[in-house]
C-alpha cells in the first residue's frame, strides 16, 4: 500500500465481497486504511463471525444474519435449491470465508474455510503465508497447502512460480526458506517448497484443492519430487 502511494499517489483500499453479496466490508474513504485488513462492514451490512456451531466468535466464518438481510444479498442460486439451503442455514448466509475481528472493528481476512489447516495445533491461513512469500523479489505466485508430517501432523508447503530473470533451484530455495524464517513466526514458517506451475480455474484463480489432493495422494511422504526442497535439507 505504501509503495503504491509513494509511486503513484493513490491509496489501495482492500475490501471483501462476493458475487452473492456484493461488497460487504471495506477500507472506505474517511477512515484510516489498516494494512492487512479488509476494513469494516459497509453501510447496510451487518457482518458477524461464527464458529463451527454457528455461535458468535472473534475469529470464524464470515456470515450475514438473514434477520438483517442486506439489499445486496442474492435471493438464491438459480435452479439449485440444495446450494441455496447450504448457504442460507441457521439464520445466516454463510460465505465459507474465515476472518478475525480486531478490537477496533476492522476485519482481517484469513482464507476459505476449506483452505485453513492446522500445524502443531495452530490454525494457519494460506492467504497470510502466500502474502508474505510474494514479497520476495523472486516469487511471482504462491499457493500454500498442508503437507503430511509425522511430528506436526502437517506443515506448510508452498508451490511457487518464479519471476523472469530468476532460476529455480537449491540456492533460491535456501533464500526463500531464510526469507520465511525472517518474516514468519516459527509455527508459520514454510517447511517445504516446490517450484511448479500452479493449476488455475478458467477465471485465473489458483486451485489449491488440486495441490492439496496431490499432497494427500503421496502420503506417506516419499523421496523429494523434482523441484521440491525441504527446509531441513538446508539445516
Model region roles, listed by residue range:
Residues 1-15, 19-106, 112-116, 129-130:
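Conserved AMP-binding/adenylate-forming
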Residues 17, 70, 83, 98-187, ...:
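AMP-binding/adenylate-forming catalytic core of the ANL superfamily
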Residues 46-52, 196-203:
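Active-site and channel-lining beta-strand-loop segments
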Residues 71-74, 214-227:
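A short, polar/charged loop-to-alpha-helix boundary motif
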Residues 79, 89-90, 135, 213, ...:
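Phosphate-coordinating loops and pocket residues in cytosolic domains that bind phosphorylated ligands
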Residues 144, 192-195:
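Hydrophobic/anchoring residues in structured secondary elements
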Amino acid at each position: 500500500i505504501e509503495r503504491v502511494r509513494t509511486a503513484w499517489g493513490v491509496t489501495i483500499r482492500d475490501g471483501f465481497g462476493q458475487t452473492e453479496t456484493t461488497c460487504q466490508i471495506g477500507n472506505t474513504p474517511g477512515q484510516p486504511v489498516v494494512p492487512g485488513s479488509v476494513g469494516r462492514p459497509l453501510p447496510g451490512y451487518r457482518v458477524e463471525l461464527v464458529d463451527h456451531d454457528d455461535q458468535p466468535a472473534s475469529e470464524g466464518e464470515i456470515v450475514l444474519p438473514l434477520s438483517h438481510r442486506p439489499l445486496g444479498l442474492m435471493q438464491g442460486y438459480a435452479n439449485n435449491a440444495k446450494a441455496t439451503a447450504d448457504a442460507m442455514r441457521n439464520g445466516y448466509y454463510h460465505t465459507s470465508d474465515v476472518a478475525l475481528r480486531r478490537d477496533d472493528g476492522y476485519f482481517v481476512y484469513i482464507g476459505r474455510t476449506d483452505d485453513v489447516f492446522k500445524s502443531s495445533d495452530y490454525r494457519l491461513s494460506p492467504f497470510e503465508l502466500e502474502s508474505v512469500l510474494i514479497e520476495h523479489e523472486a516469487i511471482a505466485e504462491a499457493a500454500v497447502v498442508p503437507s503430511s508430517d509425522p511430528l506436526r501432523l502437517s506443515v506448510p508447503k508452498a508451490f511457487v512460480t518464479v519471476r523472469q530473470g530468476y532460476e529455480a533451484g537449491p540456492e533460491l530455495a535456501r533464500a526463500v526458506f531464510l526469507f520465511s524464517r525472517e518474516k514468519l513466526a516459527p509455527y508459520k514458517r514454510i517447511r517445504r517448497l516446490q517450484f511448479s506451475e500452479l493449476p488455475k480455474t478458467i477465471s485465473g484463480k489458483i486451485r489449491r484443492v488440486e495441490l492439496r489432493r496431490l499432497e494427500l495422494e503421496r502420503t506417506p511422504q516419499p523421496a523429494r519430487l523434482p523441484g521440491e526442497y525441504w527446509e531441513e535439507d538446508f539445516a
